[in-house]
């Protein structure tokens, strides 16, 4: 098959053909226009979200992070965690083949699909989790003075925040149950005790 369509209808068909598939949603969170931004990766089943600081909102920066995750996790675990990725039609996600494939065997590492235009609700789980990021980094905030260590800290607090949909477990706990703490460590995640969680801008005040 020389060409595979990647629209939302194709995504739904893929899920129908692979009902046990775990879904990953991918998006960007923008700081000030023209400045640093985030790539967010949301594991829908466990509500765990990863976030990576990028100097610019480019396709190359997204591919670089996907390649890094592939290297850190190894091909087998990467493909287990990322069987299918749903994202939007932003220009930063405009090179699906580079996201889907690696240079070594097995070359195919994931399947990427796109939401319909102007339909962010189709990846609503990711959008809802962004609201927690915006509690710490309000809209209009500059990300230019932040480091990746700051972003890891922010996501540790968000991923340790217990959710009703997870039966009052945190995303960290839910993800650990399915995949183990070793994988979380490889992803740069650490737990935060409930009484120490801060979901306010002061968390990242220098």
What function would you assign to each model-found segment?
Residues 14-23:
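Structured nucleic-acid-interacting core domains from mobile-element enzymes and related host factors
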Residues 16, 27-29, 33-51, 66:
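Short conserved beta-strand segments at catalytic cores or DNA/RNA-binding microdomains
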Residues 27, 78-95, 116-118:
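Acidic/histidine-rich, metal-coordinating catalytic segments
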Residues 31-34, 51-76:
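Active-site beta-loop-alpha junctions of metal-dependent nucleic acid enzymes
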Residues 76-81, 107-109:
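Short helix-terminating capping/connector loops at secondary-structure junctions
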Residues 87-89, 100-103, 112-137, 144-156:
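RNase H-like two-metal-ion nuclease catalytic core shared by retroviral integrases
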Residues 97, 139-206:
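C-terminal domain-tail junction helix/linker
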């Amino acid at each position: 098959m020389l060409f595979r369509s990647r629209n939302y209808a194709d995504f739904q068909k893929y899920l129908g053909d692979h009902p046990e598939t775990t879904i990953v949603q991918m998006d960007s969170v923008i700081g000030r226009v023209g400045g640093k931004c985030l790539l967010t990766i949301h594991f829908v089943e466990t509500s765990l979200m990863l976030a990576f600081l990028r100097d610019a909102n480019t396709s190359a920066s997204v591919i670089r992070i996907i390649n890094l995750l592939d290297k850190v996790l190894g091909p087998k675990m990467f493909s287990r965690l990322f069987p299918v990725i749903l994202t939007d039609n932003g220009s930063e996600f405009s090179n699906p083949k580079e996201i889907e494939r690696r240079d070594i065997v097995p070359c195919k590492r994931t399947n990427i699909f796109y939401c319909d235009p102007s339909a962010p609700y189709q990846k609503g789980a990711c959008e809802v989790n962004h609201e927690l990021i915006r509690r710490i980094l309000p809209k209009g905030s500059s990300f230019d003075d932040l480091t990746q260590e700051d972003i890891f800290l922010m996501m540790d607090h968000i991923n340790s925040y217990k959710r009703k949909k997870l039966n009052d477990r945190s995303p960290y706990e839910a993800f650990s149950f399915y995949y183990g703490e070793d994988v979380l460590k490889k992803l740069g995640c650490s737990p935060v005790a409930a009484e120490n969680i801060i979901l306010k801008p002061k968390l990242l005040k220098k």
